[in-house]
Amino acid sequence: MIQIVTVRSGDSVYSLASKYGSTPDEIVKDNGLNPAETLVVGQALIVNTKGNNYYVQPGDSLYRISQTYNVPLASLAKVNNLSLKSILHVGQQLYIPKGTKRAVESIAYLQPSTIPIKESLVNATRAINPFLTYLAYFSFEAKRDGTLKEPTETAKIANIATQGNTIPMLVITNIENGNFSADLTSVILRDATIQNKFITNILQTAEKYGMRDIHFDFESVAPEDREAYNRFLRNVKTRLPSGYTLSTTLVPKTSSNQKGKFFETHDYKAQGQIVDFVVIMTYDWGWQGGPPMAISPIGPVKEVLQYAKSQMPPQKIMMGQNLYGFDWKLPFKEGNPPAKAISSVAAVALARKYNVPIRYDFTAQAPHFNYFDENGVQHEVWFEDSRSVQSKFNLMKEQGIGGISYWKIGLPFPQNWRLLVENFTITKKG
């Protein structure tokens, strides 16, 4: 049985393996560790424990543990001779009955930055293929004449997906000259001839590469094009061949009348009726150009999902999950150079390099730390670890959400994938 353990001063892979009945090799593999490197105080590890024993960690509650292991709260309390309101103590041993995993769908986005695609990125894609329902290739860019600008090596990526019984997604964006374009979108939405040509080209491309989900990530669309975008999606839906699905990306909203160009065009209720599923970008509260904070704090994410559920069936919702963190220089000032994107593995390596402990914000459910670099500049880092993604998995269970969508491949986070299949059964449709 897998459990999450927070490293304390003096802990090592060997001492943790001995304490929890695991092996050093298992801990190293599951957490993507280098056996020669020391552990970081505050680092979260996943450990395969002996039998069905669980050892209470900081921040635990019976409810949280019952969610994590898919066991009814009352059953967990009864088998351990506890009341539902029992106070748990760090280190306390509990017995965890066998739970039942729910089936969900999963997506991961691939966004190559080089031509040809780096072999390391190709290998990373192959490695996580078993954990995916869909592989989203970002992106096919819409053009004003109704054609598509293809990303590099599309056939290769589509083949990798299908070889793993994963559905390749045709991700179409309104990106023009590197930015999402409202003007480009208006051309396509308002000209029937161009729109029909555009849809025809999309369907031909999807058939060519075996991409059985058509996905639109249209952002920064003019508010006055809201209804035109809904009509366009209905038009696409009516032309889809049998066996194909339609999906969209949505910005994170908490109400129908939320103002701002990023929010007004995305009509949750209409899209929930039209498309087969939606991907909600429940991340970037902490973003590169803003002050340091958790990228996907649990409270705001929950608020978005609750609103989404009021507008569409929860099984149509794919919760967005970042695989990245950010490293900000302090003090933060508007106009500073953007924060540096960083993987979970790289974040822990930074904490180790500068010999600083990792702290955990239980309100946001996110790890973070501060350090001073060689030039005396202070930094603040927020990222994801096994605790933070487990809190999101628990939220998915609580809200009955249909799946999860990861941005993006190439940012190592081995703990996530192991925990994903410990929590859920991943639906395969390929």
UniProtKB/Swiss-Prot annotation:
Q: Where in the cell is it found?
A: Forespore
| Family annotation (SUPFAM superfamilies) | (Trans)glycosidases, LysM domain
Query: A GO molecular function for this record?
Result: chitin binding
The answer, when asked if Hydrolase is one of the entry's keywords, is: yes
Question: Where does it primarily localize?
Answer: other
- What highest taxon heads this organism's lineage? Bacteria
EC identifiers of the protein = 3.2.1.-
> What are the residue boundaries of the GH18 domain, all occurrences included?
104-430
Q: What is known of its domains?
A: The LysM domains are involved in substrate recognition and binding to cortical peptidoglycans. They are also involved in directing protein localization.
Spell out the family assignment given in the record's similarity comment: Belongs to the glycosyl hydrolase 18 family. Chitinase class II subfamily.
- Protein name per its UniProtKB record: Cortical fragment-lytic enzyme
**Which species?**
Bacillus anthracis
Its taxonomic path starts at: Bacteria, Bacillati, Bacillota, Bacilli, Bacillales
